[in-house]
Amino acid sequence: MHNQAPIQRRKSTRIYVGNVPIGDGAPIAVQSMTNTRTTDVEATVNQIKALERVGADIVRVSVPTMDAAEAFKLIKQQVNVPLVADIHFDYRIALKVAEYGVDCLRINPGNIGNEERIRMVVDCARDKNIPIRIGVNAGSLEKDLQEKYGEPTPQALLESAMRHVDHLDRLNFEQFKVSVKASDVFLAVESYRLLAKQIDQPLHLGITEAGGARSGAVKSAIGLGLLLSEGIGDTLRVSLAADPVEEIKVGFDILKSLRIRSRGINFIACPTCSRQEFDVIGTVNALEQRLEDIITPMDVSIIGCVVNGPGEALVSTLGVTGGNKKSGLYEDGVRKDRLDNNDMIDQLEARIRAKASQLDEARRIDVQQVEK
C-alpha cells in the first residue's frame, strides 16, 4: 500500500457539531453549503440528502430571514447530517434556529448587533451547547481595518479574527472554531498560518469564492493542500460555483491525495500514450461513475502498459497493467489473473466490488474482536 502522510497535525481544542467531532485529532470534516432558497424546504432537503449520500459530514444553510428560520425547522426534521445556520445582522434569527435544534451557528459578532445582543446569542449557544463559527472574509472586512491596511492583508484578516475571538473570550465562551477566508490563495494561506500561531481553537479551512468547478478545484487544492500539509486545519469546505455535491467530492479528493483521510476509491491512472493496450481514459471515467457508492478506502491503479503498471500495482489494493489482448490483474501486490481488454470495465468493476466487500468484512470482524 502507499505510505501514509507524515503530517503532524496542529494541536487544537475539540468541539462537536452535532455528533461530529472537530479538532483535537478528529478526522478532518468535509462540509458544503446549500445553494437553494432555504424557504423552498423540499428543494433544500433534497440537496442536503444528496450531499449526505456523497459523504458530507456537515452542511451549512443560509438563514437570512425569519421565514427562512421557520423553514429551517422543517428542514432539520428531515435530514440526519448536522446543520450549520449561516446568520448575519439579525440576532433574533440565531435565537430562533437555536430553538429548532441547529448544530452550529456561523456568525460574525461584529455584525450581529450591540453588546447585549451578542451576549444573548452567546448565552443561548452556551445553554444549548451549540458551537459558533467565527467567519472572517477578505471581502467583508470591517471598515476601519480596510482604512488601516488599505486592502485585505493577512494581518488585517488576523486582526479581524482576533477581535471576534477576544469578544467570545470576554464572554467566557470556548466552543467555537474560526475561519479567515479569501479568494486569493496566498492571502488565505498566510492568514491561516498567522491565526494558527495565535489560538488553539479548531480552524475551518476554505478558499472563498474560488471559482467554477475546474478553476475552483485547482485553487482549493493548492491553498488547502498547503495548509493541510503543514498540519493546519480541522474542517474544510471547497467553495465552487457548481453543484455542492462536487464540493464534497473535491474535498475528499484533496484529503485522499494527502493521505489524511480516505473515503472511497483512490484511482491511480496513467495519462495514456501510444503504448496503452486498452482504453484507460474510458475505463477510469466509467468506473469513477459506476463506483461512487463504494466508500471503502482502497487504491486502484489502472495503467495502460508494462512500463509503470507493475510498479504501481505492487503498492495498490488492486492494479491493472496493460498487456496484448489481456491485461494483468494484481491484488495486494500479487499478480492474480488476466482480464480481457475488450471487457475491462465490467470485469474490473466486479473485482473492485468484491474486494471492497472483503475489506469491509475484515474490518467488521476486527471491530468485533476489539469489542470482545
Curated annotation (Swiss-Prot):
Its EC number(s): 1.17.7.3
First-tier enzyme category under EC: oxidoreductase
Any single biological process term in GO: terpenoid biosynthetic process
Keywords: 4Fe-4S, Iron, Iron-sulfur, Isoprene biosynthesis, Metal-binding, Oxidoreductase
Cofactor notes: Binds 1 [4Fe-4S] cluster.
Listed pathway(s): Isoprenoid biosynthesis; isopentenyl diphosphate biosynthesis via DXP pathway; isopentenyl diphosphate from 1-deoxy-D-xylulose 5-phosphate: step 5/6
InterPro entries the UniProt entry points to: Dihydropteroate_synth-like_sf (IPR011005), IspG_bac (IPR016425), IspG_bac-typ (IPR004588), NO2/SO3_Rdtase_4Fe4S_sf (IPR045854)
Cofactor: [4Fe-4S] cluster
SUPFAM superfamilies: Dihydropteroate synthetase-like (SSF51717), Nitrite and sulphite reductase 4Fe-4S domain-like (SSF56014)
Pfam families, alphabetized: GcpE
Annotated GO MF terms: 4 iron, 4 sulfur cluster binding; 4-hydroxy-3-methylbut-2-en-1-yl diphosphate synthase activity (ferredoxin); 4-hydroxy-3-methylbut-2-enyl-diphosphate synthase activity (flavodoxin); iron ion binding
Domain of life where this protein originates: Bacteria
Binding site for [4Fe-4S] cluster: 270, 273, 305, 312
Catalyzed reactions per annotation: (2E)-4-hydroxy-3-methylbut-2-enyl diphosphate + oxidized [flavodoxin] + H2O + 2 H(+) = 2-C-methyl-D-erythritol 2,4-cyclic diphosphate + reduced [flavodoxin]
Function: Converts 2C-methyl-D-erythritol 2,4-cyclodiphosphate (ME-2,4cPP) into 1-hydroxy-2-methyl-2-(E)-butenyl 4-diphosphate.
Family of this protein: Belongs to the IspG family.
Protein name, entry field: 4-hydroxy-3-methylbut-2-en-1-yl diphosphate synthase (flavodoxin)
Native species: Escherichia coli (strain SMS-3-5 / SECEC)
